Swiss-Prot record:
CDD domains: GrpE. InterPro entries: GrpE, GrpE_coiled_coil, GrpE_head. This is Protein GrpE. Signal peptide: none annotated. GO terms for cellular component: cytoplasm. Participates actively in the response to hyperosmotic and heat shock by preventing the aggregation of stress-denatured proteins, in association with DnaK and GrpE. It is the nucleotide exchange factor for DnaK and may function as a thermosensor. Unfolded proteins bind initially to DnaJ; upon interaction with the DnaJ-bound protein, DnaK hydrolyzes its bound ATP, resulting in the formation of a stable complex. GrpE releases ADP from DnaK; ATP binding to DnaK triggers the release of the substrate protein, thus completing the reaction cycle. The gene is grpE. Keywords: Chaperone, Cytoplasm, Stress response. It comes from the Bacteria.
Amino acid sequence: MTNKDESVKKNTESTVEETNVKQNIDDSVEQAEESKGHLQDEAIEETSDENVIEEIDPKDQKINELQQLADENEEKYLRLYAEFENYKRRIQKENEINKTYQAQRVLTDILPAIDNIERALQIEGDDETFKSLQKGVQMVHESLINALKDNGLEVIKTEGEAFDPNIHQAVVQDDNPDFESGEITQELQKGYKLKDRVLRPSMVKVNQ
């Protein structure tokens, strides 16, 4: 082979090699571009996912805030409801006490009038006019006592009962063999209660 042919061969090989290198470079560039494109697509997808998350998070936060507010309002409502129920019970109890005290004052003022009526009924007389008048007074007395009993008035039991300093007032001591020691032998003045309240203790004679 001549020097010329050898030179041509080398040039040809160099050209082929350059072409291959260029092709490899082009392929690498293309692959790099494709990889870059994939990375950009993935970045876009990740960005989209982040946007979705960013869009969801505020909603969840708002829901949590509303739930917390609802819980707080429910707690306030239950507390206010309990306070209102306690207030109603307290007012009802105060009204009942006030009614009792009002009735107590009225009945206490009436008791002397009842005593006078009962003393008048103890007077004896043979005159028909007197008897008729006494019968009318007795009917008034019974009606008054029944009306007062319907409103809680109660006569305190005395004779034969054991002396109770909470409802009885001992004014005289007695020595009666027909009664046990500490028993009431005689009632000197009637005592009255209004439900569980003593309006006036009974004045009694107590056996020794």
